[in-house]
């Protein structure tokens, strides 16, 4: 197999195919994401959005195709024309360059907020004192510097998601993936999380956000992608996709959510 890597891109997805049993989820998706941009992925539930996002940092293993981040194959290596799985330690190293913010926070309930942020860096060799200093700085950046000794159960959903974002920033990742970061929140808490994500735009990081927040997509997105039934139906600028969609499937979806 010949693999061509584009150094000008932050993320490349080539012919991504994934099925669960006999149900196709991704049907040969190709995508290139420019460095420092915000790409927003929208689409109906079950369309493959989250699966595609999870494939970028190899939380989902593709049946066919491959992913490249920063010029490096993710989760696999090319060997004598074949794709082979990397060792777990090498996959974990790669994931440290790719932040991931989950829909349901995924904080450790038995650890304090500070420990939730320091746990991974310390396990990968960062000195505890340095990890704590960084964690405190990150908590301050998301407005939670007074919560370092609290436990997740003592925080609101919005606060927990802000901690999750701080944790994703702990390795200073090149790319940050957000999997519907506001969908588990009460409506009044959505704004505080979107404000933190908004603050990350223009920092040089590449953000890829799966969301149902169409207004947010219009405001911060450089590129909007509409996915349905495992394929990219339409993509372009927010104005093109959200305000002047060409494909009937895009038009139908937006008519139901706007």
Over which residues does each language-model region extend?
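Catalytic Walker B motif of ABC-type/P-loop ATPase nucleotide-binding domains
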Residues: 176-179
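H-loop/switch region of ABC-family ATPase nucleotide-binding domains
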Residues: 211-212
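Helix N-cap at the start of a conserved alpha-helix in ABC-type nucleotide-binding domains
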Residues: 187-189
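Conserved signature/switch motifs of ABC ATPase nucleotide-binding domains
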Residues: 150-153, 171, 203
């Amino acid at each position: 197999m010949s693999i061509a890597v584009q150094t000008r891109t932050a993320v490349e997805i080539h012919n991504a195919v994934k099925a669960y049993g006999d149900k196709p989820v991704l049907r040969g998706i190709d995508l290139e994401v420019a460095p420092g941009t915000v790409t927003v992925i929208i689409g109906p539930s079950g369309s493959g959005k989250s699966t595609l996002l999870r494939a970028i940092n190899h939380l989902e293993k593709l049946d066919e195709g491959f992913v490249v981040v920063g010029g490096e194959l993710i989760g696999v290596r090319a060997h004598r024309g074949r794709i082979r799985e990397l060792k777990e330690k090498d996959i974990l190293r790669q994931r440290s360059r790719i932040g991931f913010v989950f829909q349901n926070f995924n904080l450790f309930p038995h650890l304090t907020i500070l420990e939730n942020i320091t746990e991974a860096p310390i396990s990968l060799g960062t000195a505890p004192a340095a990890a704590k200093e960084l964690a405190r700085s990150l908590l301050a950046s998301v407005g939670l510097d007074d919560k370092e000794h609290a436990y997740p159960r003592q925080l609101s959903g919005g606060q927990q998601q802000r901690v999750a974002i701080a944790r994703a920033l702990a390795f200073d990742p090149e790319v940050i993936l957000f999997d519907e970061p506001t969908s588990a929140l009460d409506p009044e808490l959505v704004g505080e999380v979107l404000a933190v994500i908004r603050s990350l735009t223009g920092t040089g990081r590449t953000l890829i956000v799966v969301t149902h927040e169409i207004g947010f997509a219009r405001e911060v997105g450089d590129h909007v992608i509409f996915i349905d039934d495992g394929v990219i139906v339409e993509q372009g600028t927010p104005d093109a996709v959200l305000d002047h969609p060409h494909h009937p499937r895009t038009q139908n979806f937006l008519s139901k959510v706007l």
